[in-house]
Amino acid sequence: MKVSDKDKKGLYSYDRYIAAHTIMFSFEGVPGIYFNSLFGKSNDEAKYIITGNNRDVNRYRWNELNILKRMKNKNTKEHYIFETFKHLLNIRKKQKAFHPNALRTNINLGNNFFCIKRISLDKKQTILCLTNLTSKLQNTKINKKFSKFKNLIDPHTKFQNLKSINMKPFETIWLSNT
């Protein structure tokens, strides 16, 4: 988790990492997550250099005591990433629109956003999954019908009767009608 063309100084490395996974969590099917990804572990490039085996890049071996210690410390990357993923996956598993076979529709909002709409099999729940793909505050207009939806990720956020949404760098919102 270093820098990218969208985050040249690496100021939002955790946010970018979580945004990438949140996008994956919004797709159909069951998300596959590498064990190391649960803790935000970077690729093990040193291991790859030693072995030359491409697969070794994501096969970091944890010391059980070390990871447990880092998980207990609320100030570590490992704790933050794991708790955030746990929060997102707990939300996801409760939503009918995130059923593996629920409908997905892509919505083009330009290069600064990733957006899809998920509709439950019974057509009763719609979730708009929206991610800011940049390191800047972005504003996007939203369809009037979505302005009364609630944000599943942060229920304290109110979007009542909005015509547009301001989104922080690499922020994701899941707007649901139920």
Pin down the residues of each PLM region.
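Loop/helix patches that line or flank the sugar-binding groove of alpha-linked glycan CAZymes
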Residues: 1-127, 135-137
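Conserved active-site loop/cleft motifs that coordinate metal ions or position small ligands
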Residues: 33-34, 128-131, 151, 176
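Surface-exposed beta-strand/loop patches in extracellular or lumenal glycoproteins
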Residues: 131-147
